[in-house]
Amino acid sequence: MDNSSDEESEISESEIDVYYEKPYEKLMNGDYKVKVKDTFRCPFCAGKKKQHYKYKELLAHASGVAKGSASRSAKQKANHFALAKYMENELAGDADVPRPQIPSSSTEQSQAVVDDIYVWPWMGIVINPVRRTDNKNVLLDSAYWLKKLARFNPLEVKTLWLDQESVVAVIPQFNSGWSGFKSVTELEKEYEIRGCGRKDWIDKRGDWRSKAYGWCARADDYNSQGSIAEYLSKVGKLRSFSDITKEEIQNKSIVVDDLANKIAMTNEDLNKLQYMNNEKTLSLRRVLIEKDELDRVYKQETKKMQELSREKINRIFREKERLTNELEAKMNNLKIWSKQLDKKQALTELERQKLDEDKKKSDVMNSSLQLASLEQKKTDDRVLRLVDEHKRKKEETLNKILQLEKELDSKQKLQMEIQELKGKLKVMKHEDEDDEGIKKKMKKMKEELEEKCSELQDLEDTNSALMVKERKSNDEIVEARKFLITELRELVSDRNIIRVKRMGELEEKPFMTACRQRCTVEEEAQVQYAMLCSKWQEKVKDSAWQPFKHVGTGDRKKEVVDEEDEEIKKLREEWGEEVKNAVKTALEELNEFNPSGRYSVPELWNSKQGRKATLKEVIDYITQQVKTLKRRRA
């Protein structure tokens, strides 16, 4: 039989109460088969792995889907609602109801027991005649009879004194379930076998005061006269087997409905938690994607600025070489001109005066060119020093913070270009200010200088924006790690691959092993272990104890645990290498993750690789656990 009718369209939540009548009719007509031999099946979930249910299991399944399954459609809810109604109305008699074990040997006796009217909760009656040798106070003690009848497991015992016949009446009360009926039946059977049943008590044959009589309390006892009947009517009531069975069925139906509602509510809560978890996972994934994109853009921008910086430096060196060649050519021309002037002879005073003026002018020009050459040389030296200094700083910063220092490198190169242009402008001020070519060149260099300053400001703005984005991303990652540590602390154990580890706490296993090897008695080993572990945990947290040393040089210099420390050596000699390594590991963790506080801090940990877990590993692990949980629920 198919799970649903193809000819019927989907329905809304508000139509469930109306639509369920159609599948209910088909269930009544036998179109859907529910009961197969001694088991039950869901005709609307034929594709599921489980096909055989008990009555209670199928009723709980149908009620849970009808009332609370968020993953089911309204049509499926209506079908299961009809199935639950059908089972409650038509198949209630097929429910597994426990029947009492009636201790009799024949069918007629069993039917007679079932048809009897009993006092409920189940009670027995024991009559003990008091003889002259008996202690009346002992026989009236309830504790005495609780101990004497302990093999029948009574809940409590009531004793009554029947003055008319001088007997003690004992009324034990039993469990109201079928186990209580079994106990009171065993009591009655035991007394009947000894010939001390209710009939024997009524007949009172022979030496009847020498024996105790017992039987199960029934309607005759309840409706009789006397203190026994008064007590029975006070604490109990008359019930038949059919009444008790019906009440049991009703109670079980109520329990099943309650459990179905709880299952539905639990499923709804689980779906909400799963939705929240998916939201958090997607948020973390978006943060990581944004961070990766920022890193990619940052690297591209850094590479682009480096290429621009190299190109500009090469252009500066080419321009410097060209200016140097021009200066040398002019100096050579001046030398040739000076030699020519020296060779000329002044024919007249006017010519000599003109010649003197030309010489002075030549000397002034030569002096200016020499000063300009010296200034250019100084500027070149400064440029070379700036380049060398920039290279040295670049190598140092790459070992510390590669990405940010690459931006600073570009910024420094641009500043160097600006200084170079300022130097050139300063040199040109010493040249002939009336030269139109020099003026145009100075104007062009000023414009280029302004362009470089604007470009430097743009670089600084870009660098500031990238640094703000990076700080924001880092803050979000830190908050994400804190959130994961808080949420996962109660959800994972030390056996999980991804877990929350308290960095700086001692590993207890080496201490326990060492104490057990030294102490043969387990209790002594436990005490020794607790004292030793507590002592060294406090020692590790003590900031005054600094068992560290520095190894390596320069950038490779780092701080490690000094195994030659007196306390460390003493611990190794007394308790062995494994205990020493446990203390060493705790010190290294504190020195790495909390060097200032010297107290343990929680951290996401990859147990498989023995290192700090990345956010990507934690998210992948959570996703895998959610998928596993879905498969188990399915």
Swiss-Prot record:
Pfam families: XH, XS, zf-XS
Any coiled-coil regions, as ranges: 254-469
Any GO BP: gene silencing by siRNA-directed DNA methylation
Signal peptide stretch: none
Keyword terms of this UniProt record: Coiled coil, RNA-mediated gene silencing
Keyword Transcription attributed: no
PANTHER family tied to this protein: FACTOR OF DNA METHYLATION 5-RELATED, RIBONUCLEASE P SUBUNIT P38
Chain's role: Acts in association with FDM3 and FDM4 for RNA-directed DNA methylation (RdDM).
Identification of the protein by name: Factor of DNA methylation 5
